[in-house]
């Protein structure tokens, strides 16, 4: 599910466990990772996990992604919990890696 900067800020302020894939439409590695991120999200939903996975198109949220979250490359995955960033990686993660990261938040 795609999320906006306003929605993400609200979830961070509420202390929710969220993992976000930051992407652009022109990024080839982003396109490769998209179905794996979606599959990981579905598996976590099926497990009734309290961790939510979202995507954010940084072209639609440029100022927030670059100035606030300091995204420099895509794909970038960031995890948030307890009101702060607790995970950051750049590059492709496979489905099981995404799930492992999410469960460690």
Positions of the model-derived regions?
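A short glycine-leucine-enriched loop at secondary-structure breakpoints
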Residues: 67-72
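Secondary-structure boundary motif
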Residues: 13-14, 42-46, 104
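Thiol-based oxidoreductase modules, predominantly thioredoxin-like and allied folds used
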Residues: 2-4, 22, 34-41, 45-63
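Short active-site neighborhood of thiol/selenol oxidoreductases, capturing the structured segment around
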Residues: 13-25
């Amino acid at each position: 599910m795609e999320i906006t900067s306003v929605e993400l800020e609200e979830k961070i302020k509420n202390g929710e466990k969220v993992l976000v894939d930051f992407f652009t439409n022109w990024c080839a590695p982003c396109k490769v990772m998209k179905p794996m991120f979606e599959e990981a999200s579905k598996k976590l939903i099926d497990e009734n996990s309290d961790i939510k996975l979202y995507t954010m198109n940084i072209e639609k949220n440029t100022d927030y992604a670059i100035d606030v979250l300091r995204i420099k490359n895509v794909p970038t995955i960031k995890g948030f919990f307890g009101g702060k960033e607790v995970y950051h990686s750049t590059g492709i993660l496979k489905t099981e890696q995404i799930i492992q990261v999410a469960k460690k938040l």
